[in-house]
Amino acid sequence: MKKTVFLSLLLVVLLVFVSCSGGNATSQSSTGSTGASMSVSTLQTIMDRGVLRAGIALNGPPIGGRDDKGQPYGYDVDFAQKFADTLGVKLEITDVDGETRIPALTSGRVDIVFANMTGNLERAKSINFSTPYLRAGIKMMVRNGSSHEVVEDLNSSSIKIAVARGTTGEELALAYAPKAELVYVANFTDQTLLLKQGKVDATFEDSTLIDFTAGQSKGELVARSKLYTSDPICIGLPKGVMEFVRYVDMFVSWMISSGWQKETYMKWWGTEPTAELVALW
């Protein structure tokens, strides 16, 4: 019942917004090129199809991973499933990583991306972002016994850092440890493996991943305490679909104000969120 009421409310607000845009919306919709017509079509297409195609990074628990049977799980999986449930459709997951998550969206392979992605101005040139549904900061992880405390300690040609392309961690390493050798891998799972094997000296990722992984390593890995960023983790959406973006913003806001986001965070991390999120609606 709550899902039906919520969905109905969102659709009403969406239609009111479109109708209030006046003559421009009417004249432009006849060309089939407006953001309003595209966004309504996007939402309706998903509902008519009966399937939400979501790109999710399944390489870094507890944000996203696979269990022993290969089934997806994690915070992003729960969020995507909740959104699909709200629309009354099934969830279809495409596994993406730092390099493929934006192309998957811009190519139309997926409708939406839940992939632990920081919203920033550079990425916003290619895609749209929702209001943040999580906040995190970049941290450094090293092996137990390492003398490296901060990123500047890694600025040496003898140092190797594991990073994934297109990530904030890569940007940080390039900016503050330019002399170090960057070892590029596909995902955070591979970053962790190389670090455990002693093939690299450090790696960088969101605190949500670093803290969880170090805590599960039985003392083998250590998360350094310094936070290098305070990043808005946002849902990725296609360009030109602003009413779809507005709909997703309302969904995220509802999840925050209802307490569902906090409960889901505590489910996966065992603690309350370290940063407060703001509901826009």
Regions found by a protein language model. Name each.
Residues G32-N116:
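Extracytoplasmic small-molecule ligand-binding "clamshell" domains
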Residues R135-V142, S207, D211-V252, T271-W281:
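Periplasmic-binding protein-like
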Residues T31-A36, V77-T86, G145, E152, ...:
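Extended ligand-binding regions for polar small-molecule ligands
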Residues L15-S19:
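C-terminal motif of bacterial Sec signal peptides marking the signal peptidase cleavage site
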Residues T100-P103, M117-K125, L172-A175, K196-S230:
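A ligand-binding cleft/hinge motif common to bilobed small-molecule-binding domains
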